[in-house]
């Protein structure tokens, strides 16, 4: 169901939650535990935030620095799909246009389309 329809059809205060994907290298279980706790509030949807890439600079020791792109919280699309499938709650991935190339943005949108995730915050 579309978020706007969920909001309009609700006769009482409605809740939604914004979550962060797990840090790179960690699992999703802690996130599931958090959602299990929050489900008692009957959230109408869950927003999954995307974090843009960060840049760190490595000193090469010769007066030059190497710029490296780092994504600490990848997985917005995968987390959205996992939540939607596990909990049957509408998900709203927050997709950024900065920090990604046009091609990367297109791939994210295509992945969401394939997963039938149609509600987006851009």
Label each region the model flagged.
Residues 1-17, 84:
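N-terminal amphipathic alpha-helix/helix-capping segment at the start of soluble metabolic enzymes
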Residues 26-32, 97-114:
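Glycine-rich anion/phosphate-binding loops
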Residues 21-23, 53, 96-100:
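Short histidine/acidic/glycine/proline-rich micro-motifs that form metal-
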Residues 13-21, 44-48, 91-95, 120-122:
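Hydrophobic faces of well-ordered beta-strands that scaffold small-molecule active sites
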Residues 1-4, 32-36, 76-81, 109:
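Generic structural signal for well-ordered alpha-helices
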Residues 22, 41-76:
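Glycine-rich, proline-tolerant flexible connector loops at the mouths of alpha/beta enzymes
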Residues 13, 64-90, 96:
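Flavin-dependent oxidoreductase catalytic cores
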């Amino acid at each position: 169901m579309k978020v706007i329809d969920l909001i309009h059809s609700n006769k009482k205060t409605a809740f939604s939650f914004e979550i962060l994907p797990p840090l790179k290298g960690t699992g999703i279980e802690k996130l599931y535990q958090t959602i299990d706790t929050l489900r008692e509030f009957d959230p109408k949807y869950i927003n999954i935030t995307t974090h843009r890439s960060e840049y760190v600079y490595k000193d090469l020791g010769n007066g030059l620095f190497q710029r490296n792109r780092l994504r600490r919280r990848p997985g917005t699309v995968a987390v959205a799909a996992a939540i939607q499938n596990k909990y049957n709650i509408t998900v709203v991935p927050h997709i950024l246009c900065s920090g990604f190339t046009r091609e990367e943005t297109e791939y994210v949108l295509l992945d969401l389309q394939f997963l039938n995730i149609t509600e987006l915050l851009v």
